[in-house]
């Protein structure tokens, strides 16, 4: 590309080279900022060919840029030790313990990793069939497909640390005690907050005058199907994500290049100045 282009060519990526073998660089210069907050070992892992273990930046800006703009210490949503390394030290444990982590969401996975790095014998118990918790919902939202890479990376690291993983069954206190667990970490996650509006509780069990009532988790997971005209109660981050999901409804599949180009007015015809034309956004499937 460089030999044919008069301008500099830039790219944004969050992994260690899209699987390219170490020692075969495809770029003249690599510049990183946020990815090094997410994983200070980024370069070392990439050099050793451990791209699948790189802790991925999900470009959320919530703990790095947002904190910086608020005159707070910058850290990282997927690496809470970022900028706290001298305070949250992962020192070798003086005695190995058998520890159970209840919940295989993001908090449980990272807690298990920290404990295993200190030398403990760790088992994760997840009642659902898959690990990831809320990340499994977030990665279905258009624009957040990259979240899946962060989830895969921590699971790969846990496998390397020989962390035991049990899914598809809730564990009881009696079972934990019988199996000799010395410590238990509770990381069971969150549930959608149900507003105390008249009829909402009843609607979640069925419908209200033919209108479906659903939580964000039920909609995004596909447990309930949305209609053609949807009201979203709540305008925070989750409400916005739900609206995006409902308008595109791609079920977390990456958008095709052809569709993206059309939506943003990018054309491949080199005779067009700047390779731009009038954008042609796709018509939303429903009103929100």
Task: Map each language-model feature to its residues.
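Flavin-dependent oxidoreductase catalytic cores
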Residues: 1-102, 106-122, 130, 193, ...
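Short hydrophobic core segments
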Residues: 125, 180-189, 231-233
């Amino acid at each position: 590309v460089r030999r044919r282009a008069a301008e500099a060519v830039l790219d944004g990526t969050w992994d260690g080279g899209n699987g390219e073998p170490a020692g075969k660089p495809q770029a003249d210069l690599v510049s990183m900022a946020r990815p090094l907050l997410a994983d200070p070992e980024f370069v070392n892992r990439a050099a050793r060919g451990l791209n699948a273990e790189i802790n991925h930046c999900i470009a959320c800006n919530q703990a790095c840029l947002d904190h910086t703009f608020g005159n707070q210490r910058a850290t990282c949503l997927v690496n809470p030790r970022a900028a706290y390394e001298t305070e949250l030290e992962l020192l070798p444990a003086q005695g190995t313990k058998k520890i159970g982590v209840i919940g295989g969401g993001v908090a449980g996975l990272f807690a298990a990793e920290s404990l295993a790095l200190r030398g403990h014998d760790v088992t994760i118990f997840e009642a659902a069939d898959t690990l990831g918790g809320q990340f499994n919902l977030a990665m279905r939202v258009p624009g957040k497909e990259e979240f899946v890479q962060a989830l895969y990376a921590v699971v790969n690291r846990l496998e390397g640390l020989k962390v035991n993983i049990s899914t598809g069954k809730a564990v009881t206190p009696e079972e934990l005690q019988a199996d000799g667990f010395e410590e238990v970490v509770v990381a069971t996650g969150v549930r959608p907050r149900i507003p105390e509006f008249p009829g909402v509780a009843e609607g979640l069990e069925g419908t209200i005058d033919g209108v479906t009532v659903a939580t964000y988790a039920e909609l995004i997971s596909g447990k309930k199907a949305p209609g053609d005209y949807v009201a979203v109660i709540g305008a925070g981050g989750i409400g916005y994500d739900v609206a995006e999901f409902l308008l595109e409804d791609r079920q977390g599949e990456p958008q095709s290049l052809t569709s993206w180009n059309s939506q943003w007015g990018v054309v491949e015809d080199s005779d067009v100045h700047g390779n731009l034309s009038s954008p042609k956004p796709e018509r939303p499937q429903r009103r929100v």
